[in-house]
Amino acid sequence: MKIRPLHDRVLVKRQEVESKSAGGIVLTGSAAGKSTRGTVTAVGKGRVLDNGDIKPLDVKVGDVVIFNEGYGAKTEKIDNEELLILTESDILAIVE
């Protein structure tokens, strides 16, 4: 199945979180937490402005991003892969 985000939405594949602490302790379950870093797999055409123009998104497919998994984030399981649908404003930074 292929998903194409609309408007200012971005599809992100969450990166795996490190399962060891800095001291070498193996973390499991909720102790490991969920990563707030992922790879952009698809983007919408852009945000629709009040005058009807479309402002292209700053992120592109392949960017590694740090995101805020807030109220607007939606998790979807597609082809046995967990993906997040975020708005561009949920993305805090692009990792360069």
UniProtKB/Swiss-Prot annotation:
SMART domains: Cpn10. One of its GO terms (cellular component) is cytoplasm. Its main location: cytoplasm. It is found in: Cytoplasm. InterPro entries: Chaperonin_GroES (IPR020818), Chaperonin_GroES_sf (IPR037124), Chaprnonin_Cpn10_CS (IPR018369), GroES-like_sf (IPR011032). The keyword Cell division does not apply. One of its GO terms (biological process) is chaperone cofactor-dependent protein refolding. GO terms for molecular function: ATP binding; metal ion binding; protein folding chaperone; protein-folding chaperone binding; unfolded protein binding. Keywords: Chaperone, Cytoplasm. It holds the Pfam family Cpn10. PANTHER family: 10 KDA HEAT SHOCK PROTEIN, CO-CHAPERONIN GROES. Together with the chaperonin GroEL, plays an essential role in assisting protein folding. The GroEL-GroES system forms a nano-cage that allows encapsulation of the non-native substrate proteins and provides a physical environment optimized to promote and accelerate protein folding. GroES binds to the apical surface of the GroEL ring, thereby capping the opening of the GroEL channel. Belongs to the GroES chaperonin family. NCBIfam families: PRK00364.1-1, PRK00364.2-2. Heptamer of 7 subunits arranged in a ring. Interacts with the chaperonin GroEL. This is Co-chaperonin GroES. The gene is groES.
